[in-house]
């Protein structure tokens, strides 16, 4: 039996968190034993325990911007050494046979590769472009220490392979999958009532972390002319910020309140029943201003039968087939994004056609079953 130690960067329930949960939930319990160490407590802890994982919280450092200064570097490496020793003790005590680093922000897997001689799978959910020094540093570490670098899309794989530190045969693409038992089409009339949205309203929705690059600002700029022209249209945003970055939500709330169509814009924090939200939307929009590796929210909205609009970069280009299940705009061009939204806002038939194609494409290319099978086969190689 493979005893796998998963190292992850948080305990919330966003994209990479959900992907980890679904993987562990789907693994054969007689072939794999999942151990997860998280840097903090949160909703993910109990969710993982419910699917059979052994979970421990140890306050190990996650590579964040706050460490990108001389004082921060010293603080990071002091914590890194101290907590890595604790995790190594856990790994030895529990007979761990394989390490799965679930993000580039977690570097502790290197310690166990070096000290315990355990194979290391590095699961890359990010496309890190800036700062270039950090991108080069992480690629160097992955190239030197990872036995296999798993990327969530070809966009991520191509980015990683550009590094002189990474060998092509180190990299394997495994698409994330979503559970169609959870994400599926459903009647959303009660959800609209819950949020005070008319049944005949056109709802343009966005779900995503409020951070520097998910594109909430571009979303607001793009939907404003559409809301002005259609008093029955509603823009709906859902998502929270990282701890310590709550000011981003304050800025977003101010932008909404200052908008000339503020009465047609609704925003909520993280919402656990996202299936309800997707089904309430007529159009799903994710205008990430940096290349998004393979945004889980896009897959979830596709599974719920929604047309998708986004920017033409990153993994979205592999999820959305333009003119078939969605439309893409030139990155960081809100006016062009607005035209794409308007095209679907004006055409009910096209929205329905794209929505059906979204479900078909998600089931064919991004199924949960293929995601779990591909990882199981990789684990068995070690």
Stretches found by the model and what they are:
Residues 17-22, 202, 206, 211-225, ...:
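A conserved mid-protein helix/loop that constitutes part of the nucleotide-sugar donor-binding site
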Residues 29, 158-163, 169-170, 177-194, ...:
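Acidic anion/phosphate-binding donor-loop and adjacent secondary structure
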Residues 244-249, 261-271, 277, 327-328:
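Active-site donor-binding acidic/aromatic loop of nucleotide-activated sugar
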Residues 322-323, 327-334, 343-349:
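Conserved acidic donor-binding segment of nucleotide-sugar-dependent glycosyltransferases
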Residues 307-310, 320:
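Short hydrophobic beta-strand element within catalytic cores of glycosyltransferases
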């Amino acid at each position: 039996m493979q005893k796998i130690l998963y190292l992850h960067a948080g305990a919330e329930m966003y994209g990479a968190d959900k992907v980890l949960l679904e993987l562990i939930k789907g693994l054969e319990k007689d072939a794999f034993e999942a151990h997860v160490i998280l840097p903090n407590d949160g909703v993910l802890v109990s969710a993982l325990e419910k699917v059979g994982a052994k979970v421990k919280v140890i306050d190990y450092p996650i590579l964040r911007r706050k460490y990108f200064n001389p004082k921060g570097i010293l603080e990071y490496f002091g914590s890194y050494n101290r907590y890595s020793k604790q995790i190594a003790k856990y790994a030895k005590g529990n007979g761990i046979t394989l390490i799965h680093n679930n993000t580039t922000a977690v570097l502790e897997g290197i310690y166990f590769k070096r000290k315990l001689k355990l194979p290391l799978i590095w699961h890359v959910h990010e496309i890190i472009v800036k700062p270039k020094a950090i991108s080069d540093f992480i690629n160097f570490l992955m190239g030197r220490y990872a036995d296999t670098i798993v990327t969530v899309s070809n966009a991520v794989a191509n980015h990683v392979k550009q590094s002189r530190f990474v060998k092509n045969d180190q990299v394997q693409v495994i698409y994330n999958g979503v559970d169609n038992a959870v994400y599926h089409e459903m009647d959303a009339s009660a959800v609209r009532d819950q949020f005070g949205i008319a049944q005949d309203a056109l709802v343009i929705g966005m779900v995503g972390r409020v951070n520097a690059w998910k594109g909430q600002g571009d979303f607001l700029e793009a939907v404003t002319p559409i809301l002005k022209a259609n008093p029955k249209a509603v823009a709906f945003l859902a998502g929270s910020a990282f701890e310590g970055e709550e000011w981003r939500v304050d800025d977003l709330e101010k932008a909404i309140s200052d908008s000339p169509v503020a009465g047609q814009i609704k925003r909520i924090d993280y919402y656990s029943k996202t299936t309800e939200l997707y089904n309430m939307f007529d159009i799903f929009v994710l205008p990430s201003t940096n290349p998004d590796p393979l945004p889980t929210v896009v897959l979830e909205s596709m599974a719920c039968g929604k047309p998708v609009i986004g920017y033409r970069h990153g993994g979205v280009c592999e999820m959305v087939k333009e003119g078939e299940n969605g439309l893409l705009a030139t990155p960081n061009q809100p006016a062009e994004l607005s035209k794409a939204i308007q095209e679907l806002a004006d055409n009910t038939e096209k929205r329905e056609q794209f929505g059906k194609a979204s479900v078909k494409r998600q089931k064919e290319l991004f199924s949960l079953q293929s995601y779990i099978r591909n990882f199981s086969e990789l684990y068995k190689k070690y």
